[in-house]
Amino acid sequence: MNFDFSEEQQMVRDSIARFVQDDYDWDTRKAIVASGEGMSRDNWQLFAELGWLSIPFAEEHGGFGGNIVDLSVVMEELGKGLVVEPYFATVVLFGGLIKRAGSEAQQAEWLPRICLLYTSPSPRD
């Protein structure tokens, strides 16, 4: 049995690791936490543009159709960087709930919004 990450998983892992290393140092993180929102909208937008928000969702909803391993790659790298943006709450918890228990109408309404980041001015609203 092969437990190596796929090429796509390695690319995602490397892109998140590079983001954390180059753009998410301790002082940046402290400034984000101290801000009024407690997160960076610019970073959240970047996550959407890079496809990180859409990894676990079906292609029909704007996602990549990823699986739990794909999601764990993202969570591991974000965790290593102590990234404070609400990936877990938004994508894993809320998105996962809608994906697994939502009606077709709810999935069609909410999952593309998570993938493409257009629910509201702030992802926590």
Feature map (PLM): residue ranges:
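Non-transmembrane alpha-helical segments in soluble domains
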Residues: 17, 95-98, 111
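N-terminal glycine-rich flavin-associated loop
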Residues: 85-104
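Short secondary-structure capping/junction motifs at helix and strand boundaries
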Residues: 104-111, 120
